[in-house]
């Protein structure tokens, strides 16, 4: 099973990266793949309570790949790190199958509390360059996190989140229009003029009514 996962990791590179040309190139030059393999070994030692050895492996991997993955983090099959440099994955992070992350991604905590404090990333999610997913939250199946986003709340399945803080803009293939366009922003001066115009029309009506009463008297 372990070696099957390693083979799947290689195949995933070919599936995800059109620049991959040969097995020898992928095995020798893809730092994201090296980081994943190192983590799988470190995690195996961590589960056997060989914590120090697991941390040594993860630190050596960090030095050579620029990717920091705590050996306690749980990572599923066919995980792909594209470019890799600057990726951080915290201790209690849980990642499902077929997940892709890009360079500069942080799956981190929001404080120094004990217990579950890092994100859970469900199957088929994609987290783009520089995104920060923080805290004990869940990123749903097939969700996409836009580049540079900061996500602090749960992300629904099959949705796209962008911005700081992250907000859902697409869910189940349908756009959610939560962005205020500049032309749609409220204009307090214009609103006040319109209110004054309504008051003037009301006063004109009252004056006209009084004039008619005086003429009739």
Swiss-Prot record:
GO terms for cellular component: cytoplasm. GO terms for biological process: cysteine biosynthetic process from serine. Inhibited by cysteine. SUPFAM superfamilies: Trimeric LpxA-like enzymes. CDD domains: LbH_SAT. It is found in: Cytoplasm. Keywords: Acyltransferase, Amino-acid biosynthesis, Cysteine biosynthesis, Cytoplasm, Repeat, Transferase. The keyword Transferase applies. Its EC number is 2.3.1.30. It catalyses: L-serine + acetyl-CoA = O-acetyl-L-serine + CoA. Pathway: Amino-acid biosynthesis; L-cysteine biosynthesis; L-cysteine from L-serine: step 1/2. GO terms for molecular function: serine O-acetyltransferase activity. Pfam families: Hexapep, SATase_N. Its main location: cytoplasm. Belongs to the transferase hexapeptide repeat family. This is Serine acetyltransferase. The lineage of its organism: Bacteria, Bacillati, Bacillota, Bacilli, Bacillales.
